[in-house]
Amino acid sequence: LGLAVADEDDLDFNWLFAAYVNEEHPAVQQILKEALDAGVVDNFSGYQEGDPDDVLKQVYAIWHVLQARGIRYSNITRTASEHANVMSQHVRFIDESLAMTQANCVDGSVLFASVLRKIDITPVLVLVPGHMFLGFALDEEGEEWAYLETTLIGDASARRTGGGNGGGRPKPGGPQRPPVSSDIDASLASFEAAIAEGQRQVDEAGEAFADESNRDYQMIDIQAARELGV
């Protein structure tokens, strides 16, 4: 996926990244279940609470569980067919990223966007030169946004450990929680760093996103893509 050059005109196919966002993938429900079982949040309510902090907490719950699964950054972008006039990008499907526990910037962004759409939090895919990260609305009206550098997900250890119920003793007669380490502080610190880095990149871009002719800076609206049949 990317740009194709026809004569001197670039054909922009970046909107196709939205096709990799799949909120109906069965793995999405499993991720949400693990997040609830881990106890980071009691429920996924989207914007119902009307509190941006509640939205951030829900996104963090997903971050924490993906860290527990061992997802790490992997900069694999090469495609099977390369052409001088086509700039392309390899994108993993959700199940590939989860099975291989690795994701590049695009893989991680579409994975998070898929889960957020499932819980009615509005995501966008943010494109800057040579890179992608995630944006998401903190309110239903889309007046306040946060940005997440998904490649930092491997920077803290919230890995699975032995045992159940958050690494401790399982509750008798109750459902088993996924064995997630109790080092919430390190996990939360990495999430806060990823939010700060996402915001830094948006601030650095300045007005570039407002220039529709600048294809290097785009925010791909997944809902708009869905309405167009993508």
Tell where the protein language model's regions lie, with residue ranges.
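A structural boundary/capping signal
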Residues: 1-230
